[in-house]
């Protein structure tokens, strides 16, 4: 059966047929591929995790389509070594095998860090959502992103209320370009200091007392949080560009509060 199939005339390549609309496409490819990757871990050398991967290339105006299967073939080609130090090589392979000028690779994955409760010293794993965003045209570009949960306590509510202050869980999202390698754990530590208190996955009663009192003594607006992060990130000479966002999931309002700052070393 297979031999008979192979004897048939070759199948036409519709993707390579000419498109007459004369419109190039900036990004075309595949999204949301679940795939194992390896991430460098400050304490354990490396960490295996599962990423949701997007892969794109540009498409010249004269081609009807790209070859979608080649994206997955490239992932399988690097199946044992999908890691940060291989991203540029993977992008180069994408450009070569898909005849592209630009290639883009996006990965979102859970990353786990062992955290110690502040008083009981109980240890537990904390999950953080991280992203790798890489592209290759004439040069390689890479952006590391992390979503860091924190607690925020409202300074205005503390000032006005006789019985405490409203507080909530917040998400701070940081993205950085760097000239020298930065550990994910170090970036998490920096951002956690910008809220009213860090968030933990395991707290005993004595820890809860400590965390809530710390938050009360350290009230922060979203504006305070992104400004604190900006001060700390500007002091890191190996960061050439960053963006930082804070979103408070307000406990007494229907809306969320939001603030964002973007800076480059040149500016």
Swiss-Prot record:
Give the catalytic activity.
GTP + H2O = 7,8-dihydroneopterin 3'-triphosphate + formate + H(+)
Pathway annotation: Cofactor biosynthesis; 7,8-dihydroneopterin triphosphate biosynthesis; 7,8-dihydroneopterin triphosphate from GTP: step 1/1
Single Gene Ontology MF annotation? GTP cyclohydrolase I activity
Annotated GO biological processes are: tetrahydrofolate biosynthetic process
Class of this enzyme: hydrolase
Pfam families given in the database record: GCHY-1
- What Gene3D superfamilies is this protein classified in? Urate Oxidase
Key words, A-Z: Hydrolase
Site residues (May be catalytically important), renumbered to this chain = 154
Q: What does this protein do?
A: Converts GTP to 7,8-dihydroneopterin triphosphate.
Q: List the HAMAP family.
A: GTP_cyclohydrol_B
Family stated for the protein in its record: Belongs to the GTP cyclohydrolase IV family.
Q: What is this protein called?
A: GTP cyclohydrolase FolE2
Query: Which gene specifies this protein's sequence?
Result: folE2
């Amino acid at each position: 059966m297979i031999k008979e199939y192979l004897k048939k005339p070759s199948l036409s390549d519709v993707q390579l047929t000419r498109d007459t609309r004369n419109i190039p496409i900036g990004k075309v490819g595949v999204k949301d591929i679940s795939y194992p990757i390896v991430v460098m871990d400050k304490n354990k050398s490396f960490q295996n995790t599962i990423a949701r991967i997007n892969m794109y290339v540009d498409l010249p105006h004269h081609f009807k389509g790209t070859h979608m299967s080649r994206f997955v073939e490239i992932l399988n080609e690097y199946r044992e070594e999908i890691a940060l130090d291989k991203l540029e090589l993977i992008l180069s392979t994408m450009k070569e095998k898909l005849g592209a000028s630009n290639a883009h690779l996006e990965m979102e994955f859970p990353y786990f860090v062992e955290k110690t409760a502040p008083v009981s010293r109980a240890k537990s794993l904390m999950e953080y959502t991280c992203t790798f965003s890489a592209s290759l045209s004439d040069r390689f570009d890479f952006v590391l992103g992390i979503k860091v949960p924190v607690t925020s306590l409202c300074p205005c509510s503390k000032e006005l209320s006789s019985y405490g202050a409203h507080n909530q869980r917040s998400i701070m999202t940081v993205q950085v370009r760097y000239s020298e390698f930065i550990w994910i754990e170090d970036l998490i530590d920096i951002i956690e200091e910008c809220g009213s208190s860090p968030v933990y996955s395991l707290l005993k009663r004595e820890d809860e007392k400590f965390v809530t009192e710390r938050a009360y003594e350290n009230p922060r607006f979203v504006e305070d949080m992104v400004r604190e992060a900006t001060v700390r990130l500007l002091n890191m000479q190996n960061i050439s560009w960053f963006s930082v966002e804070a979103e408070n999931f307000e406990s007494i309002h229907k809306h969320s509060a939001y603030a964002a700052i973007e800076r480059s070393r040149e500016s």
